[in-house]
Swiss-Prot record:
<feature type="binding site">
    <location>
        <position position="296"/>
    </location>
    <ligand>
        <name>(3S)-3-hydroxy-3-methylglutaryl-CoA</name>
    </ligand>
</feature>
<feature type="binding site">
    <location>
        <position position="266"/>
    </location>
    <ligand>
        <name>(3S)-3-hydroxy-3-methylglutaryl-CoA</name>
    </ligand>
</feature>
<feature type="binding site">
    <location>
        <position position="199"/>
    </location>
    <ligand>
        <name>CoA</name>
    </ligand>
</feature>
<feature type="binding site">
    <location>
        <position position="201"/>
    </location>
    <ligand>
        <name>(3S)-3-hydroxy-3-methylglutaryl-CoA</name>
    </ligand>
</feature>
<dbReference type="GO" id="GO:0019287">
    <property type="term" value="P:isopentenyl diphosphate biosynthetic process, mevalonate pathway"/>
</dbReference>
<protein>
    <recommendedName>
        <fullName>Hydroxymethylglutaryl-CoA synthase</fullName>
        <ecNumber>2.3.3.10</ecNumber>
    </recommendedName>
</protein>
<keyword id="KW-0808">Transferase</keyword>
<dbReference type="GO" id="GO:0010142">
    <property type="term" value="P:farnesyl diphosphate biosynthetic process, mevalonate pathway"/>
</dbReference>
<feature type="binding site">
    <location>
        <position position="153"/>
    </location>
    <ligand>
        <name>(3S)-3-hydroxy-3-methylglutaryl-CoA</name>
    </ligand>
</feature>
<comment type="function">
    <text>Catalyzes the condensation of acetyl-CoA with acetoacetyl-CoA to form 3-hydroxy-3-methylglutaryl-CoA (HMG-CoA). Functions in the mevalonate (MVA) pathway leading to isopentenyl diphosphate (IPP), a key precursor for the biosynthesis of isoprenoid compounds that are building blocks of archaeal membrane lipids.</text>
</comment>
<dbReference type="InterPro" id="IPR013747">
    <property type="entry name" value="ACP_syn_III_C"/>
</dbReference>
<feature type="binding site">
    <location>
        <position position="112"/>
    </location>
    <ligand>
        <name>(3S)-3-hydroxy-3-methylglutaryl-CoA</name>
    </ligand>
</feature>
<keyword id="KW-0012">Acyltransferase</keyword>
<keyword id="KW-0414">Isoprene biosynthesis</keyword>
<dbReference type="InterPro" id="IPR016039">
    <property type="entry name" value="Thiolase-like"/>
</dbReference>
<comment type="similarity">
    <text>Belongs to the thiolase-like superfamily. Archaeal HMG-CoA synthase family.</text>
</comment>
<feature type="active site" description="Proton donor/acceptor">
    <location>
        <position position="234"/>
    </location>
</feature>
């Protein structure tokens, strides 16, 4: 039995702030961050946007690409920034897209890989027959404390994928995961901003898990990097996925179509999924996609995906990912702080 993606959609808020604008406020060297992180600007949610609205927009774009909301039997939303501690984002999405009441829904958390965990769970639910189709979403309005290095990259956006047994635009050939207890990045209940281990987030966190899961996938599938047309890795910045890709033997040409972070920042649970959406926007039938996510705490999910002939029928039915990214309105730091709730405007 083949499982795959039958529809997809992404959404990125239109507002941006440049690295220079943030650096100016904190007295930092913008070039150090731009070159060190390989990020020029990041997306910023509007004052009335949150993870729920982003998830809804991404889901609506997936519906526009041919998914029937009445056939969706499960909705899972992965995020680090669900708007409610007790009230699922997934039920908000279900109501907004007109999904039936006879369904299951849940919110997921696993740092930046909660969205790909939602894809894997959707695959299991569909394979078991409990749902005809399932909707998996990764979305975030990422947090970064004022003046922290995370503030240069923590962004907003998300992507949605409908998983089914039929009508695939892309077949998921295999998925596998690598997981360990690694405290590289965390946020306690009630805290406004996450804390992180600085450089500890690199080799012991990101690279150990991304490289291990990726090598596991290549070994399981008996493939090599040259067998794939595209490669997408979790992108907390532009530097990490580039290093991971080159270490594994992928080329920059395979990576660049899905490398969205340099122009929109790190969307946390949406990062690898927005990258996959960008690749599906341009992919051709028969092309193969390699995807590996990463979530602090820590774990990585890898996917081997083959695009089908149906992809050309749906690509132009909803806004494309890079169209969202290129549609930018720039903010100064004061406006950005208001949009992000860093300034309390309540009387």
């Amino acid at each position: 039995m083949k499982l795959g993606i039958s529809a997809y959609g992404a959404y990125v808020p239109q507002y941006r702030i440049k690295v220079e604008e943030i650096a100016k406020v904190w007295g930092d060297d913008a070039d150090d961050y731009r070159n060190g992180l390989m990020v020029s600007e990041k997306s910023v949610p509007d004052v009335d946007e949150d993870t729920a609205t982003i998830a809804v927009e991404a889901a609506r774009n997936a519906i526009a690409r041919g998914a029937d909301p009445k056939k969706i039997g499960a909705i899972y939303v992965g995020s680090e920034s669900h708007p409610y501690a007790v009230k699922p984002t997934a039920t908000i999405v279900a109501a907004a897209i007109g999904a039936p009441n006879r369904m299951t829904a849940a919110d997921f958390e696993f740092a930046c890989k909660a969205g790909t965990a939602a894809i894997q769970t959707s695959m299991g639910v569909v394979a078991s027959g409990l749902a005809e189709t399932a909707l998996a979403i990764g979305a975030d309005t990422s947090q970064g404390a004022p003046g922290d290095a995370l503030e240069y990259t923590a962004a907003a956006g998300g992507a949605a994928f409908v998983i089914s047994k039929n009508d695939h635009i892309a077949v998921i050939n295999h998925t596998c995961s690598f997981t360990s207890d690694t405290p590289d990045f965390w946020r306690r209940e009630g805290a406004d901003y996450p804390r992180h281990g600085g450089r500890f987030t690199g080799d012991p966190g990101y690279f150990k898990h991304v490289l291990s899961a990726s090598r596991m996938m290549l070994e399981c599938q008996g493939t090599k990097p040259s067998d794939y047309n595209y490669a997408v890795f979790h992108q907390p910045n532009g530097k990490f996925p580039t290093r991971a890709a080159l270490t594994l033997g992928f080329k920059k040409e395979q990576l660049s179509p899905g490398l969205t972070c340099p122009m929109m920042g790190n969307t946390y649970s949406g990062a690898s999924m927005v990258g996959l959406s960008a690749v599906l926007d341009i992919a051709k039938p028969g092309e193969r996609i390699f995807v590996t996510s990463f979530g602090s705490g820590a774990g990585s999910d890898s996917f081997d995906i083959t695009v089908t002939d149906r992809i050309t029928e749906v690509q132009d039915l909803a806004p494309k990912t890079w169209d969202y990214i290129k549609k930018a309105k720039y903010l100064d730091y004061a406006s950005y702080a208001r949009h992000k709730g860093k300034i309390n405007t309540d009387n």
